[in-house]
Amino acid sequence: MTISEVAQGFTSADADDDRWVDPRLIRAAAGAAARGTVLLTNDGVLPLAPQTRVAVFGRVQIDWFAVGYGSGGDVNAPYTTNLLDSLVEAGVAVDAELARTYRDWCAAQAVPTPQWGDWPRFHPEMELDDETVDAAATRAEIAVVVIGRAAGEDRENVLEPGSYYLTETERRLLEQ
């Protein structure tokens, strides 16, 4: 199956009523994502050893940017996943207490469904106190910080915090 075939023939035109996705589409999309992923540096951390204890920080671990923006990107995806659920599904020993903190906060601070052309470039980050970060650090061997951005037609990146630059909350999280 080629990407062209995927784009033209294996999705439903009526996505609100028909959520079926051809399994070949799922495999092709996963393969394209793997080929499009670039790891800049590794320093021996990846792949994670089985049962490595991982603290995952950042709301985008849950509130994932699953699609792009604009005419070709603002779609009703038949399903989505997020990094936290995918790590757990893969058997990574994520810090359950920190994950629960993020799940609860994200549920209380739900990302609104935007109108066309009014998409967010980022999702506001949760402020964490030093005690929460320190406690997670004592339970985990590795920390993963997830920061997300989105852009597309009618919502290009700009040279400001929350787009190309980190917000102050993101910067503080990285410094903790």
Protein language model features and the residues they cover:
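C-terminal non-catalytic regions of proteins with extracellular/luminal or membrane-system context
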Residues: M1-Q176
